[in-house]
Amino acid sequence: MPRANEIKKGMVLNYNGKLLIVKDIDIQSPTARGAATLYKMRFSDVRTGLKVEERFKGDDIVDTVTLSRRGVDFSYIDGNEYVFMDKEDYTPYTFTKDQIEEELLFIPEGGMPDMQVLTWDGQLLALELPQTVDLEIVETAPGIKGASASARNKPATLSTGLVIQVPEYLSAGEKIRIHIEERRYMGRAD
């Protein structure tokens, strides 16, 4: 079993009977002599989706779990269920709307590349999205000429219903790149 200082973002731990995906790691090096480096890790509970935060010393032993990740494409909606198809063997994976409510805010009509499902012992656990997605602005206040010099933002509604803050110079109809985890504007899409 690895030590806490060997854990990387995206790994899955079995901690206190819960499966936790590592979302972020902050390393805190104390200034006192003999003090151990602390690793503050933010997790997402695989089963419930809740956010969890824990601290570990660098030499703490942690129990990692190997999940199976399968590339999928969005296939269709069947009532309250969303069906994703495995890219290799065409196995269907079904999620209810409640299970992937957060993820649906980032999946444009027709799906997106690089989506994966996480499974463990044949049990479907989660849908994993890439770090960024390109979405179209459908509603926002009109763009202001010369606003690029100021750092003010305005709310914008995107094609999936997600509302984020964007710079004032953007207007409806433009495609922008969004950082999914932080829900923030990164720039115009290519």
UniProtKB/Swiss-Prot annotation:
GO terms for molecular function: translation elongation factor activity. Gene3D superfamilies: 2.30.30.30, Nucleic acid-binding proteins. CDD domains: S1_EF-P_repeat_1 (cd04470), S1_EF-P_repeat_2 (cd05794). GO terms for biological process: peptide biosynthetic process. InterPro entries: Elong-fact-P_C (IPR015365), NA-bd_OB-fold (IPR012340), Rib_uL2_dom2 (IPR014722), Transl_elong_fac_P/YeiP (IPR020599), Transl_elong_KOW-like (IPR013185), Transl_elong_p-like_YeiP (IPR011897), Transl_elong_P/YeiP_cen (IPR001059), Transl_elong_P/YeiP_CS (IPR013852). Belongs to the elongation factor P family. This is Elongation factor P-like protein. It comes from Citrobacter koseri (strain ATCC BAA-895 / CDC 4225-83 / SGSC4696).
